[in-house]
Design a protein with these regions (language model features):
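Substrate-binding/active-site clefts of carbohydrate-active enzymes
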Residues: 23, 45-54, 63-233, 497
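Conserved, mostly hydrophobic/aromatic
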Residues: 2, 62, 89, 99, ...
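Catalytic cores of secreted or luminal carbohydrate-active enzymes
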Residues: 396-417
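Conserved alpha/beta catalytic core and glycan-binding cleft of carbohydrate-active enzymes
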Residues: 210-212, 226-386, 412-467, 471-482, ...
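Active-site His/acidic residue clusters
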Residues: 113-116, 382-391
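The feature marks proteins involved in alpha-glucan
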Residues: 1-61, 66-73, 80, 489-496
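Surface-exposed loop/turn motifs at beta-strand-loop junctions within extracellular Ig-like
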Residues: 4-8, 103, 527
Length: 527
């Protein structure tokens, strides 16, 4: 540690802000660590990685300490968990792992979002080399790794960056600017020294640990003072974000992903800095998440009055490159898990959750799910407990898990569902206005095929329901959320619907489809 005699005469022991490693909490001293590692074998992966605009991106967000516990061990180890984790991720057709923050932090309950060591990998889960091993193994298996990075605020603990020499070095000098809503200190992003510190830290994780991207936390608190639009734009912080993204893109030749967690409607977040934007590649679509879950919490009797909660996302979707997410924030603090947010009985919750995920995986935009979503987790996430893996011994959860993996397989193998996500030509509503029936239908358009997606968020079965389509030919059912192998009640062969030349929904052809209660249907037509 550094022993610093401050201007007031107070003597304080501080960690090294640039340390590569630290003691395990509650101890706080910095540790000298050799970062050289001669076992990297991911050269081919690094050469071929890119931002993935025309690729499938299906992210598994996880808290490494609570995914799967080791017996009699307080913490899992990066190296020990690597092969098991990577095998699981591949089996479920995820393309990337997103690790919640791994910068050192003192308080377990902050999940890593209240950092103390911006160059120090948390010692909870092993050594620097253990983390390198995990990333290297993921790359060898064709899995990308993204890390959460927190460039807006830091812990106020005495041993850390706060009032490092007795003055406001890293934070704003005025308390009303420095104090964040989380009880942490806001970085003074107007200072060149602070900007350099954070840009160096961002580069460090990509250079040293080969991360494929950074998900930037709390960007709304950089755009606006305290994240509050009424307080105005924080121009200094905004300029920092633009410069950091510009330099990261320049340094890594546009090959790493920069993802913004931003809850505001501030424009041009994913526009290039050359064109006046912030320079991110993707932005979490928190509006879509909120609107969709709000709709599905409601009794179906009242959903027709909130129909636009589902349709509104496509009104603004092409303004940014959005990433559709159900993250850790949606399954904590009394909000209930995804399946438990669904209205209805046990069986109805599962049925609606299956239809919800069909909607998610066929909606334009890249995908992210927090660990446990794929299990239909009932219990809210708790960082002290592992996932409830025992749920897979229950038929409903096991079937849902298989269904979730099938959606991932379908999404990652079908270019129509990902290649032109951000082109308006890839999506067309069939009927966005059937509020009385709680029905939604749209087309995902591709070069080789089209997909027709039908979503029924009502408890009514609609037999021989008519939908307009663009192409003639045979429409074959690829997936039905009510097939019994996925936990539904339907034991029937796939529907084959022949399009006839009758105009419907302003389309030249029409098909008749049986749509199950609380169910979704996915049909394919070849071109």
């Amino acid at each position: 540690k550094y022993r610093i005699t401050q201007a007031t005469g107070r003597v304080v022991d501080k960690m090294d802000p640039y340390a590569f490693y630290s003691e395990l909490r509650p101890n706080t001293a910095s540790v000298v660590e050799d970062l050289s590692w001669d076992r990297w074998s991911d050269e081919e992966w690094l050469a071929n990685r890119n931002k993935g605009f025309d690729r499938p991106i299906n992210i598994y967000e996880m808290h490494i300490g609570s995914w799967m516990k080791e017996e009699e061990e307080e913490f899992v180890n990066y190296r020990k968990i690597a092969k098991k984790l990577i095998r699981y991720v591949k089996q479920n057709h995820f393309t990337h792992i997103e690790l919640m923050p791994l910068c050192e932090y003192p308080f377990d309950g902050s999940w890593g979002y209240q950092c103390s060591g911006y160059f120090s990998v948390t010692s909870r889960y092993g050594s620097c080399h253990d983390l390198m091993y995990l990333v290297n193994e993921a790359h060898k298996a064709g899995i990308g790794v993204i890390m959460d990075f927190v460039p807006v605020h830091f812990v106020k603990d005495d041993f850390s960056l706060s009032y490092f020499d007795g003055t406001a070095l890293y934070e704003y000098p005025q308390a009303h600017d420095a104090d964040s809503q989380w009880g942490t200190a806001n970085f003074d992003l107007w200072k060149e020294e602070v900007r350099s510190f954070l840009m160096s830290a961002a580069s460090f994780w990509i250079d040293v640990y080969h991360f494929d991207g950074l998900r930037m936390d709390a960007i709304s608190n950089a755009i606006f003072w305290h994240g509050n639009k009424q307080l105005g734009v924080n121009e200094g912080a905004l300029n920092f974000i633009k410069r950091m993204n510009f330099l990261l893109n320049e340094r890594y030749q546009g090959k790493i992903m920069l993802i913004a967690e931003d809850s505001t409607d501030f424009p041009n977040v994913t526009k290039s800095t050359f064109d006046g934007g912030l320079g991110f590649d993707y932005k979490w679509d928190l509006g879509w998440m909120n609107d969709t879950l709000k709709y599905l919490k409601k009794d179906p009797v009242y959903r027709k009055w909130h129909h636009n909660n589902i349709t509104f996302s496509m009104a603004y979707f092409y303004s940014e490159r959005f990433l559709m997410e159900f993250s850790h924030d949606e399954v904590v603090h009394g909000k209930a898990t995804i399946i438990n947010k669904m209205w209805g009985t046990y069986e109805q919750k599962f049925a609606q959750a299956r239809t919800l995920y069909l909607y998610m995986f066929t909606h334009p935009g890249k995908k992210l799910n927090f660990m446990g979503n794929e299990l239909a987790h009932w219990r809210e996430w708790d960082e002290t407990k592992e996932n409830d893996w025992f749920l897979l011994s229950y038929p409903a959860h096991d079937a849902f898990h298989q269904y979730f993996a099938k959606l991932g397989e379908l999404y990652t193998s079908e270019p129509t569902l990902y290649a032109n996500d951000y082109s308006w030509e890839s999506f067309e509503w069939i009927d966005a206005d059937n509020a009385d029936k709680n029905l939604f239908s749209f087309i995902r358009k591709g070069e080789q095929n089209d997909y027709v997606v039908i979503l029924n968020f009502s408890p009514n079965h609609y037999a021989h329901e008519v939908f307009g389509v663009l192409q003639k030919g045979m429409y074959t059912e690829i997936l039905n959320t009510e097939w019994n192998r996925y936990g539904g009640t339907l034991d029937a062969p796939a529907q084959k619907c022949h399009a006839i030349r009758v105009s419907r929904n302003n389309k030249p052809f029409m098909i008749e489809v049986d749509v199950p209660a609380f169910g979704g249907v996915l049909l394919e037509v070849k071109k």
